[in-house]
Curated annotation (Swiss-Prot):
It comes from Macaca fascicularis (Crab-eating macaque). PANTHER family: IONOTROPIC GLUTAMATE RECEPTOR. The lineage of its organism: Eukaryota, Metazoa, Chordata, Craniata, Vertebrata. It is a multi-pass membrane protein. The modification Phosphoserine is found at residue 862. It catalyses: Ca(2+)(in) = Ca(2+)(out); Na(+)(in) = Na(+)(out); Mg(2+)(in) = Mg(2+)(out). This is Glutamate receptor 4. Residues 22-544, 639-813 are extracellular. It comes from the Eukaryota. One of its GO terms (cellular component) is AMPA glutamate receptor complex.
């Protein structure tokens, strides 16, 4: 039964083969793939698989059987061997890719053996009968675009990988229209060469570029353009490539440069959408390259399989017998033995017209694409956007740009904006228990609060990202690459920078800044000097040494003048006549103001204690009055200053200004290694700052620090031998943090501001700027600063421990007063002892007593107040007989009480 069934099938196949011109059920096709074409090979396999598994028998009455070889184009023998291998297998047509090294070998074999080659590679310059070019030519579209932009001076960057067809067309047009074109071959350029070239072109004010390179080299050129910051507003790039959406242009979106290009594949057509659904389901391990959308070369590969399948269907309908290709033979035979049906195959291929992924696929007599349409795209803030199209009939047709409704941030409302910042207290810090939080909740600080307020005003979602290298942003002098937060913006890794980022000219050239949210200047930080210990006689500090000397001389002078006027004025003399019935002179001295009483009067008035005597004459009272007025002013001034001098412990700073730093050598000083402060000194033309920059640049060890925290730590550990130059806001903040051992000295060296940064030309720029202005008007920015600088300060308003401790007096503040008191008491006792001994000696001589007996009598008198047997007080110095009566008036400060003596 099985044998009968097989015979029936064979018989039916034979009749079917006779009816259809003996067309084979399995069609052998070749595939030649070069390096870095994994995705194209995946598209090739997928197209064959979908054809062979098509449920429509009329669409796929035969199977395509591929024979694939991977070739190394640098080895011409390997290319020849691969082609001959395909030929010996009896393939009817070959799908293959080539480069400039293998194109001539493959096209020569195809022409000699009449084997058709369907290729998505760049179009050949000559006429190759058996080569079908799937890739359309860009010449017409590019020239139309240049005419539209009216470019007459631009740079044309090209390589020779794709030949010289576009270069030749541009140079011919330039000659006709008088264009000035700088054509530069970049085939052998490396990264450094690219950057040097771009810098040179920038010096020549070249802002317009046409780039005609294959995708790998093109991507590298674009990266170097970004690295040197030439992807910002003012630059315009036309990319001569058919896969505008295949190119990574995210960084150009943030930069703001105008980028124009061409797109062959329309991802909105039903056929492409259907294929994309199938493409996404491919196993990435089995189908390499399927993790990304198909490139235009992959779409051309897919269309190439469709062209071959349609060709074989057409041959089948025409009943052309291709079942026997003849003797495969040796492809290197001399003379060559071409395939007899090769002409039919080539003719049918060129007659094919299908709708593929790349639109209408049709060829002319030379195997080149005709009647195709390519879209023109421009890079907008929202990404690539179609602005027109080009075809052979209509040429360049531009679509009127539809204005974007809503605010500038409408395009980003549905995604999260990356906000780059730097870990710097008090701007951005980790919370104490940050491990318990995720995302933005891990951080706190001034800039964290500011970011939240800005996001509320412009209505966006954001994610805080700490800059990896911990730098603010500077441009490397050698590589021309930006680092830090500026680099994050320039190279498209972030969209907003909210940090203590200084607004400078060099930064403004590559990024945009908002209005300043904080004003500041460069200041000097030093280690806080030890507070000077108050001197023993610190109570003398309120008045200068010269004033004290003048007071002493004034005191002596006033006393002498008072003595003299009292001597010369008759009203100071008190000579009185004896009363009636009394004899002898009065006990009252003739003049009270002797030299010692004058000194005593002046001292009492100066001490504001007064005296028992006072001038009676007008001249004496004038002297006393002016002396009292003088002492009133001096004592009041002294008292007013005394409190401040006793309660404030002064610090003597070795540095008070930048000039002090520049003219000394003991104290080193430096800045952050990357930032605006260093740039300020590097560019300054002021002599003092130039001198400081010369020192900092050549100092060993280096005085530049990687972070602000490192600089502060160096100040604290240097024992006063290192000064750190940084922004005044940070200086003031650190001064308020424990251990409270740093201080700001002198004024600010310049005036500048911190701004919120966005990429050049970003749609966020205007919205962020308005948000900062709105926050500033009600004083919210000042409120935020007070919150993080002073409300959370740890050193008090004066930078010390607290107000109470600062105003409290210690013993050292008034020790001198106690010393004077003790000294005065000691001096008084010493004088009393001298007087005691002197009087005892005089008493011994007068009373004919020994000195020791006189001492004992005086001591007994001093202790008991009596030396007599019955307790009477003996006063040997008093007169023996005194008139009885009432107490005699005081004279010369001595009062004597007279009483009846026995």
């Amino acid at each position: 039964m099985r044998i009968i069934s097989r015979q029936i099938v064979l018989l039916f196949s034979g009749f079917w083969g006779l009816a259809m011109g003996a067309f084979p059920s399995s069609v052998q096709i070749g595939g030649l793939f070069i390096r870095n074409t994994d995705q194209e090979y995946t598209a090739f396999r997928l197209a064959i698989f979908l054809h062979n598994t098509s449920p429509n028998a009329s669409e796929a009455p035969f199977n395509l059987v591929p024979h694939v070889d991977n070739i190394e184009t640098a080895n011409s023998f390997a290319v020849t061997n691969a082609f001959c291998s395909q030929y010996s297998r009896g393939v009817f047509a070959i799908f293959g890719l080539y480069d400039k090294r293998s194109v001539h070998t493959l096209t020569s074999f195809c022409s000699a053996l009449h084997i058709s080659l369907i290729t998505p590679s760049f179009p050949t310059e000559g006429e190759s009968q058996f080569v079908l070019q799937l890739r359309p030519s860009l010449r017409g579209a590019l020239l139309s675009l240049l005419d539209h932009y009216e470019w007459n001076c631009f740079v044309f960057l090209y390589d020779t990988d794709r030949g010289y067809s576009i270069l030749q067309a541009i140079m011919e047009k330039a000659g006709q229209n008088g264009w000035h074109v700088s054509a530069i071959c970049v085939e052998n350029f490396n990264d450094v060469s690219y950057r040097q070239l771009l810098e040179e072109l920038d010096r020549r004010q070249e802002k317009k570029f046409v780039i005609d390179c294959e995708i790998e080299r093109l991507q590298n050129i674009l990266e170097q353009i970004v690295s040197v910051g030439k992807h910002v507003k003012g630059y315009h790039y036309i990319i001569a490539n058919l896969g505008f959406k295949d190119i990574s242009l995210e960084r150009f979106i943030h930069g703001g440069a105008n980028v124009t290009g061409f797109q062959l594949v329309d991802f909105n057509t039903p056929m492409v959408i259907k294929l994309m659904d199938r493409w996404k389901k491919l196993d990435q391990r089995e189908y390499p390259g399927s993790e990304t959308p198909p490139k235009y070369t992959s779409a051309l590969t897919y269309d190439g399989v469709l062209v071959m399948a349609e060709t074989f269907r057409s041959l089948r309908r025409q009943k052309i017998d291709i079942s026997r290709r003849g003797n495969a033979g040796d492809c290197l035979a001399n003379p060559a033995a071409p395939w007899g049906q090769g002409i039919d195959m080539e003719r049918t291929l060129k007659q094919v017209r299908i709708q593929g992924l790349t639109g209408n696929v049709q060829f002319d007599h030379y195997g080149r694409r005709v009647n195709y349409t390519m879209d023109v795209f421009e890079l907008k803030s929202t990404g690539p956007r179609k602005v027109g199209y080009w075809n052979d009939m209509d040429k360049l047709v531009l679509i009127q740009d539809v204005p974007t409704l809503g605010n500038d941030t409408a395009a980003i409302e549905n995604r999260t904006v990356v906000v780059t910042t730097i870990m710097e207290s008090p701007y951005v810090m980790y919370k104490k228990n940050h491990e318990m939080f995720e995302g933005n909740d891990k951080y706190e600080g001034y800039c964290v609060d500011l970011a939240s307020e800005i996001a509320k005003h412009i209505g966006i979602k954001y994610k805080i990202a700490i800059v990896p290298d911990g730098k603010y942003g500077a441009r490397d002098a050698d590589t021309k690459i930006w680092n830090g937060m500026v680099g994050e913006l320039v190279y498209g890794k972030a969209e907003i920078a909210i940090a203590p980022l200084t607004i400078t000219l060099v930064r403004e050239e590559v990024i945009d800044f908002s209005k300043p949210f904080m004003s500041l200047g460069i200041s000097i930080m030093i280690k806080k000097p030890q507070k000077s210990k108050p001197g023993v006689f610190s109570f003398l500090d309120p008045l200068a040494y010269e004033i004290w000397m003048c007071i002493v001389f004034a005191y002596i002078g006033v006393s002498v003048v008072l003595f003299l006027v009292s001597r010369f004025s008759p009203y100071e003399w008190h000579t009185e006549e004896p009363e009636d019935g009394k004899e002898g002179p009065s006990d009252q001295p003739p003049n009270e103001f002797g030299i010692f009483n004058s000194l005593w009067f002046s001292l009492g008035a100066f001490m504001q204690q007064g005296c028992d005597i006072s001038p009676r004459s007008l001249s004496g009272r004038i002297v006393g009055g002016v002396w009292w007025f003088f002492t009133l002013i001096i004592i009041s001034s002294y008292t007013a200053n005394l409190a401040a001098f006793l309660t404030v412990e002064r610090m003597v700073s070795p540095i008070e200004s930048a000039e002090d730093l520049a003219k000394q050598t003991e104290i080193a000083y430096g800045t952050l290694d990357s930032g605006s402060t260093k740039e300020f000194f590097r560019r300054s033309k002021i002599a003092v700052y130039e001198k400081m920059w010369t020192y900092m640049r050549s100092a060993e060890p280096s005085v530049f620090t990687r972070t602000t925290a490192e600089g502060v730590a160096r100040v604290r550990k240097s024992k006063g031998k290192f000064a750190f130059l940084l922004e005044s806001t940070m200086n003031e903040y650190i001064e308020q943090r424990k251990p409270c051992d740093t201080m700001k000295v002198g004024g600010n060296l310049d005036s500048k501001g911190y701004g919120v940064a966005t990429p050049k030309g970003s749609s966020l720029g205007n919205a962020v700027n308005l948000a900062v202005l709105k926050l500033n008007e009600p004083g919210l920015l000042d409120k935020l600063k007070n919150k993080w600088w002073y409300d959370k300060g740890e050193c008090g308003s004066g930078g010390g421990d607290s107000k109470d401790k600062t105003s409290a007096l210690s013993l050292s503040n008034v020790a001198g007063v106690f010393y004077i008191l003790v000294g005065g008491l000691g001096l008084a006792m010493l004088v009393a002892l001298i007087e005691f001994c002197y009087k005892s000696r005089a008493e011994a001589k007068r009373m004919k007593l020994t000195f020791s007996e006189a001492i004992r009598n005086k001591a007994r008198l001093s202790i008991t107040g009596s030396v007599g047997e019955n307790g009477r007080v003996l006063t040997p110095d008093c007169p023996k007989a005194v008139h009885a009566g009432t107490a005699i008036r005081q004279s010369s400060g001595l009062a004597v009480i007279a009483s009846d003596l026995p």
